[in-house]
């Protein structure tokens, strides 16, 4: 995974890094205790094509449906990958991600959020959350796969407006008061070429990494479980799952520099057992996802490549291989071993 952080951001983050052991010790007393990564929703240009693509590659069954949105179960569930049509005005990408939290209660969590500067939004507009440092409750009705009386779903906008959904650990995207009632999964048409087991992490590009890290740690008490260069890796639920925040820059330099990229969820990582990058690349190539090779510039759809994370970014001495591919819309997906924690070692599974 690639992270970009300026010298100013690095210096500003030093106090947080020095306090890491204290943060780890206090994580159990966090205002909102996070259990695990739940899901992400991908905005895609052709939902039918994307369902066929992910089912053919991974063999994911349909766990639930929310109107036209299909929820594909990852591993044994309830974690999932949701695929939603974007319409003419929405670009393909990772729309939002979800964390599961202990003692999920909308009123309780909204009160805690308000104490941390996140105001409840009842106005229209501003996306799912209402905008940066806003929270919005959506009551999903039976027409969208929710309970007859409605299934509450809570969306939070972080300092950059990145949307984080918060739900109960039993949430499967289905009906019931907790969204935990899902029918028997609809099997994929055929067995996938690669078997993914779980969600690993999200890498998120933000405008001010130290500010964002402070926000997530203050709310969720996320401990630092590793470093990749100057960037800390924030553990989820005791690990190995995590979140990572990188600088939002990366525009073209020179006489006519490009503007920084807007804040975004850059990519998601899925895990598989017995991860072998060569075998995975071969399977991807057989599915029509071709190696990038020596090409430079933006990575187009249906392309794969391996990045070697070296010691200067917390990788192994000879490099930790990290495999990426893009789907039909060019959305990047990372694949790693089930033990991957963002640390060192060949599998990236050595975290202090």
Each language-model region and where it sits:
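Vicinal oxygen chelate
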Residues: 2-30, 35-46, 70-71, 86-195, 281-282, 286-352, ...
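Hydrophobic, helix-prone linear segments
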Residues: 19, 28-38, 54, 70-73
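Mature N-terminal segment immediately following signal peptide/propeptide cleavage
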Residues: 33-65, 200-209, 213, 218, ...
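Residues that act as N-cap/strand-start positions at coil-to-secondary-structure junctions
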Residues: 36, 66, 148-150, 198, ...
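Short linear motifs in intrinsically disordered
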Residues: 59-64, 100, 141-147, 220-226, ...
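Short secondary-structure junctions
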Residues: 59-65, 118-123, 221-227, 289-294
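Conserved short beta-strand elements that form part of the metal-binding/catalytic scaffold
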Residues: 61-94, 101-103, 163-170, 223-265, ...
């Amino acid at each position: 995974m690639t992270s970009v952080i300026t010298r100013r951001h690095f210096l500003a983050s030093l106090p947080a890094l020095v306090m890491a052991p204290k943060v780890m010790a206090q994580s159990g007393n966090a205002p909102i205790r996070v259990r695990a990564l739940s899901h992400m929703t991908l905005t895609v240009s052709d939902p039918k094509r994307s369902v066929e693509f992910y089912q053919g590659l991974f063999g994911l069954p349909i766990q639930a449906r929310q109107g036209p949105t299909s929820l594909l179960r990852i591993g044994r569930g309830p974690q999932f990958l949701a695929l939603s049509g974007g319409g003419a005005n929405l670009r393909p990408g990772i729309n939002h991600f979800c964390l599961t939290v202990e003692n999920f209660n909308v009123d309780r969590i909204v009160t805690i959020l308000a104490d941390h500067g996140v105001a409840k939004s009842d106005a229209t507009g501003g996306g799912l959350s209402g905008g940066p440092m806003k929270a919005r409750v959506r009551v999903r009705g039976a027409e969208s796969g929710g309970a007859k009386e409605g299934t509450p779903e809570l969306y939070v906008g972080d300092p950059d407006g990145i949307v984080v959904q918060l739900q109960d650990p039993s949430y499967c995207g289905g009906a019931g008061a907790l969204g935990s009632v899902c029918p028997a999964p609809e099997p994929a048409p055929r067995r996938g070429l690669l078997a993914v087991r779980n969600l690993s992490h999200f890498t998120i590009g933000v405008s001010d990494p130290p500010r964002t890290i402070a926000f997530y740690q203050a709310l969720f008490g996320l401990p630092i479980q590793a470093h990749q260069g100057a960037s800390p890796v924030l553990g989820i639920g005791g690990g190995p799952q995590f979140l990572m925040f990188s600088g939002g820059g990366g525009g073209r330099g020179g006489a006519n520099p490009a503007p920084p990229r807007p804040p975004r969820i850059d990519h998601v990582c899925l895990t598989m057992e017995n991860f072998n990058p060569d075998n995975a690349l071969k399977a991807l190539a057989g599915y029509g996802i071709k190696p990038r090779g020596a090409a430079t510039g933006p990575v187009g759809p249906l392309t794969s490549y391996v990045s070697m994370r070296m010691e200067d970014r917390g990788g192994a001495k000879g490099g930790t291989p990290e495999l990426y591919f893009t789907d039909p819309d060019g959305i990047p997906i990372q694949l790693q071993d089930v033990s991957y924690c963002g640390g060192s070692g060949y599998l990236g599974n050595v975290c202090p």
